[in-house]
Swiss-Prot record:
Enzyme class: transferase
Alphabetical list of InterPro entries matching this protein: Dxylulose-5-P_synthase, THDP-binding, Transketo_C/PFOR_II, Transketolase-like_Pyr-bd, Transketolase_BS, Transketolase_C, Transketolase_CS
EC number assigned by the record: 2.2.1.7
The protein's name: 1-deoxy-D-xylulose-5-phosphate synthase
Length: 621
């Protein structure tokens, strides 16, 4: 059901930034109120990222009001906060399709709109890309401006500081807006600071500042006195020393929910030369009390009733794989004080809340710093501790060199608990866990396991933790398990699979949680089904036995076919000279868009019907 835009009379006048810029400045507070209410009503009907967008309503309105988008380039970091941006850039009537199959993309996406300058989803990329755009604009010479919006979490990543360090060195015209929603708006963010921000960003001050530098450049004592005076004025009210040292002119912090102050400050800053940083203070979940109170729970939400302020509880009582991991972590830590668990800012998503509370001295949240997380684990292992890195598949990509250089080459006993392996669903191309088996399988010394259910996941985590001959990865999916009952811990034999169903002619070698679909397909085909368990080392003896006693081998995995587990089987068969038909089923050579996990699996032929259909095509074509 579409939302009646007539209930939002000011928002109705601003379907795109050109129309927004025609509104009188005095109407902007009213526009913000309506935009926030529209966002609430839309996301409550469709699901999606919520709290971040509520916090950036005023900023989004001010940016599109002042800057000449899409001529000026606006770069959003991560993109969770960009729903208001989508609503104001011609996508208002489709916002209720966001994160759905064939709907709006969950993040800014270049193919979707000319207002989306960078495809995002992972954090801390905005300043690097924005710097490139700023240099291109500078050489173009048409007066195009570049603005990057980055949050206080994302700016902690090394890549953001690398970009700022570079920007400070080459001195482009670029504005970085630090959206700081970690603190409440304090007395530092009041009338004095708002006034000072407008003063320091104004043309009179900057003209005097630059003119004074030129006049007194040959009088070092006076030049130094002026510099210290300016630093003292800023230092009384702003924490900008770090950014100034990186070569940025720092303004703020100011109230990110005062749209009129934001608009005037941005208008001033658009005229400034060189690297600029505007620090704004916002509140995640602004304007909706439940989200303000608990922004983590309201970060991404299912459909909900906005009048009750209560998120619906899942009717599925089966534990998620993330919970399986978190509970196992607590069980293992109860018997081993040398266990150290590390997460790069994904405590809730990785199922580590309970562990962080019960074992705070053994828990490390290193922030958005995947590279550091992995090498930090290497240091712990060298020091005699037993580190576990809990990380999403898509984010492990960001620490690939550290896995090789700092872990595998030194053959250190580090356990990687890789969550969200395979199809993740609604977050689309940037978040599917499509590549981990491929990029880990080629690394020497690495042991890789893929459980078929939640009990096997527990056993593999236990096995990997107690395997001290080198690094181990246990890779499991997003979502709930099959309902398998947990069994007492046992260490699995390394590199050994298990036959789950004996059949004829066709053998399905399954890697991971597609096993139930494989068994369902096998019933109709009278096929053998093997739970391979290990991607590396492969159970060579079992694979060769299957090849010798079946006409067709089928490999099944929720990973890219290229370089994945199936490729490993192909390599073994070629190496051993076995001439047998083989069919690799997995993720195709394309980036998989958003949709529900069930929809995507069906589209890619990874459900029972699709598996059966692919096998029949091979058998009878």
């Amino acid at each position: 059901m579409s939302i009646d835009i007539a209930k939002y009379p000011t928002l109705a006048l601003a379907e795109n930034p050109e129309e927004l810029r025609m509104l009188p400045k005095e109407s902007l507070p009213k526009l913000c109120d309506e935009l926030r209410q529209f966002l609430l009503n839309s996301v409550s009907r469709s699901s999606g990222h919520f709290a971040s967008g509520l916090g950036t309503v005023e900023l989004t309105v001010a940016l599109h009001y002042v800057y000449k988008t899409p001529f000026d380039k606006l770069v959003w970091d991560v993109g969770h906060q960009a729903y208001p941006h989508k609503i104001l850039t011609g996508r208002r009537d489709r916002i209720d399709t966001i994160r759905q199959k064939n709907g709006l993309h969950p993040f800014p996406w270049r193919d979707e709109s000319e207002y989306d300058t960078l495809c995002v989803g992972h954090s801390s990329t905005s300043i690097s890309a924005g710097l490139g755009m700023a240099i291109a604009a500078q050489r173009e010479g048409k007066g195009r401006r570049t603005v990057c919006v980055i949050g206080d979490g994302a700016i902690t990543a090394g890549m953001a500081f690398e970009a700022m360090n570079h920007a400070g060195d080459i001195d482009p015209d670029i504005l970085v807006i630090l959206n700081d929603n970690e603190m409440s708006i304090s007395e530092n963010v009041g009338a004095l600071n708002n006034h000072l921000a407008q003063l320091l960003s104004g043309k009179l001050y900057t003209t005097l500042r630059e003119g004074g530098k030129k006049v007194f450049s040959n009088l070092p004592p006076i030049k130094e006195l002026l510099k210290k005076t300016e630093e003292h004025i800023k230092g009384m009210v702003v924490p900008g020393t770090l950014f100034e040292e990186l070569g940025f002119n720092y303004i703020g912090p100011i109230d990110g929910h005062d749209v009129l102050t934001l608009t005037q400050t941005l208008k001033n800053m658009r005229e400034l030369k060189g690297p600029q940083l505007l620090h704004i203070m916002t509140k995640k979940g602004r304007g909706y009390a439940p989200a303000e109170k608990d922004p983590i729970s309201w970060h991404a939400v299912p459909k909900f009733d906005p009048t009750t302020g209560a998120l619906p509880k899942s009717s599925d009582n089966r534990p998620t794989f993330s919970k399986i991991f978190g509970d196992w972590l607590c069980e293992e830590a109860a018997n081993d004080k040398k266990l150290m668990a590390i997460t790069p800012a994904m405590r809730e998503g990785s199922g580590m809340v309970r562990f962080s509370r019960e074992y705070p001295d053994q828990y490390f949240d290193v922030a958005i710093a995947e590279q550091h997380a992995v090498t930090f684990a290497a240091g712990l292992a060298i020091g005699g501790y037993r580190p576990i890195v809990a990380i999403y598949s898509t984010f492990l990509q960001r620490a690939y060199d550290q896995v090789i250089h700092d872990i595998a080459i030194q053959n250190l006993p580090v356990l990687f608990a890789i969550d969200r392996g395979g199809i993740v669903g609604a977050d689309g191309q940037t978040h599917q866990g499509a590549f981990d088996l491929s990029f880990l399988r080629c690394i020497p010394n690495m042991v890789i396991m893929a459980p078929s259910d939640e009990n096997e996941c527990r056993q593999m985590l236990h096995t990997g933790y107690h395997y001290q001959q080198g690094p181990v990865a246990v890779r499991y999916p997003r979502g709930t398990g099959t309902g398998a009952e947990p069994q007492p811990f046992e260490q699995l034999p390394i590199g050994k699979g298990v036959i789950r169903r004996q059949g004829n002619k066709v053998a399905i070698l399954n890697f991971g949680t597609l096993l139930p679909d494989a068994i369902t397909a096998a019933e109709s085909l009278d096929a053998t089904v093997v739970d391979m368990r290990f991607v590396k080392p492969l159970d060579k003896e079992l694979i060769l036995d299957m090849a010798d006693n079946h006409d067709l081998l089928v490999t099944l995995e929720e990973n890219a076919i290229m370089g994945g587990a199936g490729s490993g089987v192909n390599e073994l068969l070629m190496q051993k000279g076995r001439l047998v038909q083989i069919l690799n089923i997995g993720l195709p050579d394309q980036f998989v868009p958003q949709g529900s996990q069930e929809e995507i699996k069906a589209d890619l032929g990874l459900d029972a019907a699709g598996i059966q259909n692919s096998i029949n095509k091979r058998l009878f074509s």
